[in-house]
Each structure stands twice: as structure tokens, then as C-alpha cells.
Amino acid sequence: MTWQGWAEIALTLSLAVAIGWPLGVFLSRVWNGEKTFLDPVMRPVEGLFYKACGVDPSKSQSWHAYALALLAFNLIGFVFVYAVLRLQGVLPLNPQGFPGLSGHLAFNTAISFITNTNWQSYAGETTMSTLSQMLVLTVQNFVSAATGATVAAALARAFVANRGEGVGNFWADLVRTTLYLLLPLAFVVAVVLAALGLPQTLAAGVTAHTLEGAEQKISLYAVASQEAIKMLGINGGGIFNANSAHPFENPTPLTNLITAISINTLGWAAFFAFGRTVLAKKDVRALVIAAFVLLFAGAVGVYATETQAPPAQVAAQVDTSANMEGKEVRFGAPATAAWVAMTTGASNGSVNGKHSSLMPLGGGIAMFLMQLGEILPGGIGSGVAIMVVMALLSVFVAGLMVGRTPEYLGKKVEAREIQFSILAVVIIPLSMLGFSGIAAVLPEALKGLMHSGPHGLSEILYAYVSGTANNGSAFAGLTANAPWWNVTLGIAMAMGRFMPIVAVLAIAGSLVTKPKLAPTAGTLPTDGGLFIGLLIGVILILGGLQFFPAMALGPIVEHFQALDAVAALR
């Protein structure tokens, strides 16, 4: 570990928060329908969408109607993506001549992209046509991110309302977030990335002649445009199998910095937008501090583990100062550690190194950050929504200790809110532990494992927590393109996406009808250090403690096995 490495990690994480603040102010204006500098261009386009679809953007929906519209939109998206992927072989813009995907792979991929997970059981450069990449995958990168933002917007309005009825209009929130925030920002970042060397072409590829005289086909796509929204939308699915470790997706340390910051920027922006919308900037600042502390601790932990020489190399007396297996030398350990924390703390899942090659404890930290609920800062809107759920549970615990009905942001927190809050946070352990337990003993599932023992179990655990948390990263030792893995991971992704969303919207529907209360002497302050500590404690207990037995059999056992193996060689 070096001071330069610490500085690089601190700078990368801090820049994402700093850039997220002004974008959050802008996003709140978009949610609230306030005037923005993009109005002269985007207002007419926005109006065309409403007119074509017969939508009245001023009509507020109940939480039931809002949730139904959200689910219907995503169901239509699933059917469309599935159909295009299955028919890929007969559709145009397929210069590579790729056939359509199998039924189970198309099912998995369609759910993966509509849920903002971007889990990939395939290698993009050898599976997806140009049309598939552009028409369905890139489009879903935009609208799946916007879908998450709509949930936070609805929840924010519920806290502001005083005995209200509706939580907003889903269609208006979706269109405005896409047109005013995601499209312009992605355009700017795409131009910057293209200028820095990322390919942007509709050509299938080029042919290169190697030093041995052989011909090599190098795949090309419109990489820069998809890379921009892949990061900004906190999606993570790469065009190339190596993802952001591939030089066409991430060629230089500068592109690495830009894309790493992009992973978290709009997640933090949603926090600040929520705070401005609910008129509680100090309270939401406490949420940001809690999330940043946990994220920074995760990055520090990964950096500490990855700058220790692997035990086997120590035993072999190999001179090494870091574990460089699975890492790009153009980035090094600090940039990889920062990326690991940022991509697993958010629901991004892109990688600039191989997570399966991390030291056992480093891989365990990556898993742990996902187990916390993807709230550091999580997806656009979905992260702050689940963080607010954690805050509701925190004030509930505090209320139990002092014997008072808890309040948060001027609303009483009662049984209905706590019931739906528990539903929102129980999905990850239910899916991860349930599916992992079955897969660990099912021969059909075990065929996909490259490794046995603790690392094999870690591959299973990582896959299901990544799918359920809508992250999408993986331990590469798992061969996931098989019916069992594609179907069960698809179910896990759908559970992890839509069950918490419906629970949060139900909370919003309950809160919106309640009166707005002024704070009293008995109200727990939710903007100070005491609450931040309580919140972090609740997150660690709910998000981490329940997974400890399973983690003890995976990365923790693997760590001690490595130490024992080295001791035996000495």
C-alpha cells in the first residue's frame, strides 16, 4: 500500500459525490417539473411522447396505479427484448451473422437488462449482433435506469405530501428522467470517450495480420455510446466479455477514472435530488455520509487485501508486492480496488479486473457490499429508496428503545411501513441463501462450477447475491450459460428488482395519506452523528450478519485454507 494508492481511491470516490451534488439539484428540478435549461429542446419532444401515448402528465396516480404502470412497462420491455434476441438471426444489422439466442439464454438476458442487472451468461462480441446491442440492450440501459429513478421520485413526493392521494405519474417521471438527464449526459460522456479512443462504428470488425502471418478478426461495435450509458445508468453490461478490462472499453487510466466516477455519480445524484425534493437536505446528508463511510471502508478493505502478496507466492519466495492476478497492469491495484467497491456498492457490476482472482477476503468484501442491499449508493433512485427503508427501520428500532411512535421526515412510521420495509430487505437473503442451498447439492447446477471446495461455494453465493441485488458481476469460474443457471438467475433478478420496488411504492402510498408533522422535543434527530451510527449498525446487522454462516463456508474458509497450505510448505 502506498500513499499514492490511498489518494487515488479517495479522489475517485470523492469526485463521484462532488459531481453528483449539482446533478442531484438538476434531477430534483426534473422530478418536480421545474424549468431547466434544456426546456427549449426537450419540452416539445416530451410533449410528443405524451400525445402519442395518450398520457396526461399532470394526472397523479395512486401507488397501485403507479406500480401497475411500472410493471406493465417492464413486462412489455421483456417481451420485446426476448423476441429480438430469439429472432436475431433473421433481423437486419447483423453483419457478424450471429444466430438467435436459445430460449433460456434469451430469457435470462431479457430479464437481466430490464431489471438493470446486466448479468451476462454470454460473450457479447461472439453472441450479440449490432442490432441487438443497439435496439434492445442499449435502450434498456436507459429505461431500466429511469425506472429506478421513478421509484425514488414517488417516495419523495409521499414525504412532502400532507394528507395527499397520489404519488405522481409514472409515465411523466420515466420520460422526463430519460430525456432531461440520461440522454444528454450519456451523449456528452460518449463523445468524450470516443475522443479518448473508444471505437464508435457500425462495422462488424477489422482483420489484422499477426506477426506469425495469421489473420485475426477483431470485433468492433458502437462502443463509446453504449459504454457511456452502461456506466451512467449503473447498468454494467459490457459489449466485450472482458468488460471494462478490455482495451476497447477502457483503454487508458484517464478513461478508467472517467468511467469509474460515472458508476456512482447518478446514484449520489439521486440522494441529493431526494433531499432537495423532501426539503430535508441535512437528513439526507446523513444518509450520504453513512453510505460513503461504508463504501470507503469497503474500498480500503479490498485495497488492503490486494496489496498483500498471495500466500502461495510467499511460500515460493516470489518477490511481489501485490496480488496482480486478474488485474490490468495499466490500472494497478488501487484503481482496481476502487472499482471493485464502487461497482458492488452500486448496482453496476462492470469490472476492470476479475473478481474471481481477488484474494479470498477481497472477493468476500465484494460480496458483502452487495449483501448490504446495493445502497452505496446503489442504482439511480433504487439505492436511495432502499436507504430510506433502512432509515425507517432505524427510527423504528430507536422508537422501541424509548417507547415512542417513530417519525421520519415529518411522517409517523407505523406497522404498515415496517412490514413493507422488512419485505424490501428480506429478498436478498431469501433468494441468495435459498437458491444457493439448492444449487450446492443439485448435480445439474454443480456442472457449471470450475472449482470445488470453498471457492466453488463462493462462485454460487456470488452469482445469486449479484443477481438478486441487480448487480451483474460474477466470479468467472462459473459457466452460467445453462438452463438451470439462466432460469434461476432470471427469477432471482426479477425478485430482487420488482419485489422491493412494489414494497417501496406501498410505503409511499401509506405515507402520502398521512399528515405532515412538525418536529417536537421527542422527535429523534435524523441528521446527526448518533443517527448515522445507528443507521450503519442497522445496515450491517440486516445486510451482513444474516449472511455470515454462508460466508464463513466460502471466502473465509478459503482464506484460512490458503494460509494453512502455505504453512505446510514451510
Swiss-Prot record:
Task: List the GO cellular component terms.
Answer: plasma membrane
Q: Which UniProt keywords apply?
A: Cell inner membrane, Cell membrane, Ion transport, Membrane, Potassium, Potassium transport, Transmembrane, Transmembrane helix, Transport
Keyword Oxidoreductase in annotation = no
Q: What is its main location?
A: membrane
What membrane topology term does the record carry? Multi-pass membrane protein
Q: Give the GO molecular function terms.
A: P-type potassium transmembrane transporter activity; potassium ion binding
What family, per the record? Belongs to the KdpA family.
Q: What is this protein called?
A: Potassium-transporting ATPase potassium-binding subunit
What organism is recorded for this protein?
Caulobacter vibrioides (strain NA1000 / CB15N) (Caulobacter crescentus)
